[in-house]
Amino acid sequence: MLKDIVLVLALQLVYVPILTLRTIFMVKNMSLLAAFMGFLEALIYVFGLSIVFSGKQSYIVMIVYAAGFGARGFLLEDISSKSWAIGYTTVTVNLQQKNQELIHLLRESGYGVTVYTGEGRDSQRYRLDILTKRNREEELLELIERYEPKAFIISYEPRRFKGGFLVASMKKRVKRKKECHES
């Protein structure tokens, strides 16, 4: 019976990351991967329930199943969704002054930055459009906050993009920067 309890708990803890990935893949229109994750999700679900409903002392296993269901969300869901940040984010930063130091640092850190000059209500404003991988968004926001604490920032997920400064260039630039600092 202890083996069943441990197995049910383990199945529940594996179930959440698969459910999270399936949802992410569905939202990103990655149908084949979403379908595969759905298959795994159903397999784990049916297997777990079959263990719960078999045996003489299934009420204990049912409680563990329910507890595992609650614990998995508490322990894993937030962690898995942040660490698997799939895709890209566009961050728009509005500044009162053109901060060349920030712009240079962002580019040296591997971010694609486009700078626009615009007319605000009272004065000229500067807008930075920055494309980054979702898993680097927090790092980017911290960097901006450090250099421009009063910046107005909007981030959103682009549905589609073509051309421009993409990840290959970002990776090359970061790699070159690391090589320069190591030598």
From Swiss-Prot:
Classification lineage: Bacteria, Bacillati, Bacillota, Bacilli, Bacillales
HAMAP family recorded: UPF0316
Protein name: UPF0316 protein GTNG_0803
Cysteine disulfide partners in this protein: none
Record flagged with keyword Cell membrane: yes
Database matches in NCBIfam families: PRK04164.1-5
Similarity comment: Belongs to the UPF0316 family.
Keyword terms: Cell membrane, Membrane, Transmembrane, Transmembrane helix
Membrane spanning stretches: 5-25, 33-53, 59-79
InterPro entries: DUF2179, DUF5698, UPF0316
Topology of the protein relative to the lipid bilayer: Multi-pass membrane protein
Species, as recorded: Geobacillus thermodenitrificans (strain NG80-2)
GO cellular component: plasma membrane
Localisation per UniProt entry: Cell membrane
